[in-house]
Every structure is written in C-alpha cells, then in structure tokens.
C-alpha cells in the first residue's frame, strides 16, 4: 500500500492557525461509513448523532508548555521541546541547536532555570533539571503548537490548545478532537443518556512526523504512553450489554482502546504503544469516531481510512476542501460511523 495514495491537495488558506471564538462554533462533517453519505452540520449538532446508551471515550491528557528557549553555558542558542517527562526532574527532549550539546553540557533556560544534558538516546536528549520540571514548564515554557500553525504561541493558546477536561499532564500535542467540547456540551451529552469515560494517552511530538517511506507497511510508528483503566473496560462492557455504541473522541482515544484490545478483548493496560492502524487492520472496540481533519499522507488519515473506508474518506476530504472546512488542530471536525466492510486503496 503506497503512502502516496493518501495525498490530497490542501490550499494553505484552509489551515486553521487560530481557534474560533467559541469551542463548539466549528463545523461538523458527518460521514456514515456504511453508506458513504455526507452531511454538513455544526459541531453543536453532534447531539443529533448520539443515542441514549452510547459511551463516549475521551483522552484526558494535559498538554504541558513543553517548548523552552535558552542557551548553552558557552553561549550557543538552542530550543528544547520536551517529549516525555521521566520523573520529577528528568525529561527526554528534542533539541534544536547549531551544534548538539554533549553530555555534561549545562543549559540555561530563558526566564530562569537550568538543566544538564546527561546522555543522548538516538534523536532524543536526556536532560536533568535543577528543579522540578513541571512547575518550571508552567512558569517559563511555551505551548508546543504544531509546526503547520507557524506562529509564536500566545496567552490564549494556554487555554484553547487544551481540552476543558484535561487532567493528567504529559502531552506535547493536544488531542484535538476534544478541543470542540465545552462544559455545556458535555452536560447536554450526559443529559441525553450518553455515558462518558476517560483514557490517557500522552501525545508525543512524533504525531507530526511525516511518513518517510514509500510503502505504508515499512513505516515504524513512534511510541507513546497510555493508560486504559478497569473503569473504562467496565464502561465498555455495560455499553455493549445495553446495545450502545463506543464513540471515541479523537484518534488518540481510538489508539488507546485498540491498543488495550490487541488480542480482541479489551483489558486494562498501562504502558507504551506503537500501534499503527491502516486499511486492513481490524477494530475491536470503537463504533464511531469524532476527529479533526488530518494532514495529507499522515498516519492519522490512514487510521480514518481504515475506519470509514478509503474511498469514503478521500471523498469526504475532497468535499471538505471544496466546502472550505478548516483543517488540522484548530480546525473543524468529523463524526464518522464505522464502515463494517471498509475498502483500501488497492481494493
């Protein structure tokens, strides 16, 4: 299966670089997977697609202000993007600098704080900070906006590049499907008889890395930490018993649930995942999906194609471009019901 099969042309003007004034003001493109039927709606209309007895599963990870600016003690400027917090004062990070720091190099953080480079792990650097790292990031860190937003972060991003239900700090990218939900919409969803549950997947910077191989099967996924608790397993079981659907909010929720059900049965799971879902891979848990519009040739577009079917997905994206939908993290959303017999690009 070729990566190029997942290319589509996207005008620059359709890349959303700022959020809309209200979270639920986005548009919603509904795709019925079994029929390929499309409906152009507003995100607040999501309620029309939910049924009493359904279960919505959200990712409650919290984005940390993971980008730091600073310099080596010798004077060379650098930029640090924390990838993973290892413990109270140690992290794995990407570093952009004219010359990579060597072990023992002291880094002075702009705004206050310092760290020592301990060792290198392939493309990542292990850093030890002189103080607890999460409070330091909250004090002097910058929100790690995706590269395609192409602007400095501002004060509004601290609130808007974060879901209203974010709890567990550790992500360096937002689970963006969740950005559309405000407290009032969540209350309305529960009032309709739809249950909610929360998984955690700390989204890594690898989510933005392009696929650099020609054939999908040769791609190696980045690893991310996730946790699916017994409460989620029980909620899914109750939902199934009453004939409800499991509605995943975001591809990270999909990857969490399907990682915890790799043998076909959903079980509690805590640890790293490198699950790669593309056309031909089965889904064991998720029946419907809320998701944003993804980058051309990205692994997330491949996941959506596996869920809805390749021709249906690409037709929906073509319609979204033609209708001027806003794309990517701060953009519009889709509601998709799973296609029971999805076709791939080679079918």
Curated annotation (Swiss-Prot):
Q: Which keywords are on file for this protein? A: Cytoplasm, Queuosine biosynthesis, S-adenosyl-L-methionine, Transferase
Write out the GO cellular component annotations. Answer: cytoplasm
Instruction: Quote the catalytic activity from the record.
Output: 7-aminomethyl-7-carbaguanosine(34) in tRNA + S-adenosyl-L-methionine = epoxyqueuosine(34) in tRNA + adenine + L-methionine + 2 H(+)
Keyword Metal-binding belongs to the record: no
Where on the tree of life does the source sit, at the highest rank? Bacteria
* Example of a GO MF term: S-adenosylmethionine:tRNA ribosyltransferase-isomerase activity
Family to which the UniProt record says this protein belongs: Belongs to the QueA family.
Q: Which PANTHER family match?
A: S-ADENOSYLMETHIONINE:TRNA RIBOSYLTRANSFERASE-ISOMERASE
Where is this gene product found?
Answer: Cytoplasm
Please spell out the taxonomic lineage of the organism that makes this protein.
Bacteria, Pseudomonadati, Pseudomonadota, Gammaproteobacteria, Pseudomonadales
Q: What is this protein called?
A: S-adenosylmethionine:tRNA ribosyltransferase-isomerase
Keyword Translocase recorded: no
Q: According to its UniProt entry, what is the function of this protein?
A: Transfers and isomerizes the ribose moiety from AdoMet to the 7-aminomethyl group of 7-deazaguanine (preQ1-tRNA) to give epoxyqueuosine (oQ-tRNA).
Assembly and partners? Answer: Monomer.
Report the EC number(s), separated by commas if there are several: 2.4.99.17
Report the pathway entry: tRNA modification; tRNA-queuosine biosynthesis
The record's listing under Pfam families reads: Queuosine_synth
InterPro entries, A to Z: QueA (IPR003699), QueA_dom1 (IPR042118), QueA_dom2 (IPR042119), QueA_sf (IPR036100)
Top EC class of this enzyme: transferase
One of the GO biological process terms:
queuosine biosynthetic process
- Biological source species: Pseudomonas aeruginosa (strain LESB58)
């Amino acid at each position: 299966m070729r990566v190029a099969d997942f290319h589509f042309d996207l005008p620059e003007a359709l890349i959303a670089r700022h959020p809309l004034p209200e979270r639920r003001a986005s548009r919603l493109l509904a795709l019925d997977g079994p029929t390929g039927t499309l409906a152009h709606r507003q995100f607040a209309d999501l309620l029309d697609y939910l049924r009493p007895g359904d279960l919505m599963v959200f990712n409650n990870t919290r984005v940390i202000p993971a980008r730091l600016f600073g310099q080596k003690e010798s004077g060379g400027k650098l930029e640090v993007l924390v990838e993973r917090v290892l413990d109270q004062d140690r992290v794995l990070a990407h570093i952009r600098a004219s010359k990579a720091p060597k072990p023992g190099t002291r880094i002075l953080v702009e705004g206050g704080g310092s760290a020592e480079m301990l060792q290198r792990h392939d493309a990542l650097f292990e850093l030890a900070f002189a103080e607890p790292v999460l409070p330091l990031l909250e004090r002097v860190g910058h929100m790690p906006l995706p590269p395609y937003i192409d602007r400095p972060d501002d004060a509004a991003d601290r609130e808007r590049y974060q879901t209203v239900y974010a709890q567990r700090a550790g992500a360096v990218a937002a689970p963006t499907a969740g950005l559309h939900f405000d407290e009032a919409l969540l209350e309305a969803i529960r009032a309709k008889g739809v249950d909610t549950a929360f998984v955690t997947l700390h989204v890594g910077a690898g989510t933005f890395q392009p696929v650099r191989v020609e054939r999908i099967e040769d791609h190696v996924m980045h690893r991310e930490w996730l946790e699916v608790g017994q409460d989620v397993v029980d909620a899914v079981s109750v939902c199934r018993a009453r004939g409800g659907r499991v509605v995943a909010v975001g591809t990270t929720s999909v990857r969490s649930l399907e990682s915890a059900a790799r043998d076909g049965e959903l079980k509690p799971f805590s640890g790293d995942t490198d699950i790669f879902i593309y056309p031909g891979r089965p889904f064991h848990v998720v029946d419907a999906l809320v998701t944003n519009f993804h980058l051309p040739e990205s692994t997330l577009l491949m996941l959506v194609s596996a869920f809805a079917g390749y021709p249906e997905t690409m037709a929906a994206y073509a319609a979204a471009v033609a209708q001027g939908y806003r794309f990517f993290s701060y953009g519009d959303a889709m509601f998709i019901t799973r296609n029971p017999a999805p076709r791939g690009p080679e079918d």
